[in-house]
Every structure is written in structure tokens, then in C-alpha cells.
């Protein structure tokens, strides 16, 4: 059973529409569907809501610590409510998936994502669920003929808003992810993963 859903991003209006905040977009949508309001909760270092989702009580969290300190917020809430790593789902932007893709998985490395790296360090575990929301990679924007030796600026890419066509694809992937949330929250995470991946995400 999933008891805590965390969306990763950076705080502040200047980051709201940037690719790195894709995790926030998903949690915002979940809060809207539940009729819940995310409020600043200092003890959890983020915006927090306790929501009733699909018949289950679920904690929603958007850390306001900046991405590379996300673990501080996650561990504070997890310890307070005695939530195990395997009961946590972290939604985050994923460079290695194209816009329009979303994948669910348990455990694994950080893939260079500083938010995941910090969460794993604070939880002393990598065994939490990740919802990877594809944003594409800046190398994909470089013509193939010019890719040899090119060094794409990843930091600049994730801190910029997606193009309109990319945003539409990302929104569609988030909708598909939301459609399997009832299954995941009730503890049928493997089934939710199969449904999401089968639906072309």
C-alpha cells in the first residue's frame, strides 16, 4: 500500500513551469482530485496535505527544500507517521524518458537525479517506488550530425519550461499515471506498473 506520495521540484514561482517540477504537477493534480489543499508544514519542510484518495488515507508532500535536499522533508514525514520506504512513491522528472512517457518502478539508483540521491541517503534505502515522468534530454535537441563531442547543458534544460508540444505530451503521461493511482495506492503496485506500461506510457 502507498501511504505517502511525494512530488519533487523546486520552490518559488520562477520554477513552477520548469521541467524539473514535473513531480509537483502530478501531486498538485492529485490534491485537486481529492479536494485537498497543500499547506506549508514546517515540521515536514514542505507543502503537505492528508488526502482521502480512492478510499484510502494518503499523505501528499511537495518538499520546499530545493531539489538536492528533498530527503530532509521525506524522512521527517516518514518518521513522524512511521511510513516504510516501500510505502512511499516519489514522482519526479526523468531525463532518460521522452516527453509522453511515464514509468513506475521500485528501487534502483538515482540516475543522476539529485532529489532521488538525497532521499535514498536520508531513508538509508533505495527501496521506495518512483514514478518517472519523461521530460526528454537536451541531447535530443542537437542535430545528429552535431552530437559528436557536444556537451548538452542538462542543468539549464531542466530549469526551463517545456515547449508547448512537450508540455502536452507530459500532461498526457501524468493523466495516464493518475489513472493507475487507485491500483497503486491500494497496494497492487505491480499491477499498476503493468497497466501504466501497457497503456503506452
UniProtKB/Swiss-Prot annotation:
This chain's source organism reads Burkholderia pseudomallei (strain K96243)
Name the domain of life this protein comes from: Bacteria
The record's function comment reads: Hydrolyzes ribosome-free peptidyl-tRNAs (with 1 or more amino acids incorporated), which drop off the ribosome during protein synthesis, or as a result of ribosome stalling. Catalyzes the release of premature peptidyl moieties from peptidyl-tRNA molecules trapped in stalled 50S ribosomal subunits, and thus maintains levels of free tRNAs and 50S ribosomes.
Q: Name the chain's protein.
A: Peptidyl-tRNA hydrolase
Catalytic residues at 20 (proton acceptor)
Q: Which gene encodes it?
A: pth
Any single GO molecular-function term of the entry would be: tRNA binding
Its Gene Ontology biological processes?
Answer: protein quality control for misfolded or incompletely synthesized proteins; rescue of stalled ribosome
Tell me which EC number(s) this protein carries: 3.1.1.29
Amino acid at each position: 500500500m502507498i501511504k505517502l506520495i511525494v512530488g519533487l521540484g523546486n520552490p518559488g514561482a520562477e520554477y513552477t513551469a520548469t521541467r524539473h517540477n514535473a513531480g509537483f504537477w502530478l501531486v498538485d493534480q492529485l490534491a485537486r482530485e481529492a479536494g485537498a489543499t497543500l499547506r506549508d508544514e514546517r515540521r515536514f519542510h514542505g507543502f503537505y496535505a492528508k488526502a482521502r484518495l480512492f478510499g484510502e488515507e494518503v499523505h501528499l508532500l511537495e518538499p520546499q527544500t530545493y531539489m538536492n535536499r528533498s530527503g530532509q522533508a521525506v524522512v521527517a514525514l516518514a518518521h513522524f507517521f512511521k511510513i516504510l520506504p516501500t510505502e512511499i512513491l516519489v514522482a519526479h522528472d526523468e531525463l532518460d524518458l521522452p516527453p509522453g512517457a511515464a514509468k513506475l518502478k521500485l528501487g534502483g539508483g538515482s540516475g543522476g537525479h539529485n532529489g532521488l540521491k538525497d532521499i535514498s541517503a536520508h531513508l538509508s534505502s533505495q527501496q521506495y517506488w518512483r514514478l518517472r515522468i519523461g521530460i526528454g534530454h537536451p541531447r535530443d535537441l542537437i542535430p545528429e550530425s552535431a552530437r559528436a563531442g557536444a556537451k548538452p547543458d542538462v542543468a539549464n534544460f531542466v530549469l526551463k519550461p517545456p515547449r508547448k508540444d512537450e508540455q502536452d505530451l507530459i500532461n498526457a503521461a501524468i493523466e495516464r499515471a493518475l489513472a493507475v493511482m487507485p491500483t497503486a495506492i491500494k497496494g497492487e503496485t505491480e499491477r499498476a506498473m503493468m497497466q501504466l506500461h501497457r497503456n503506452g506510457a
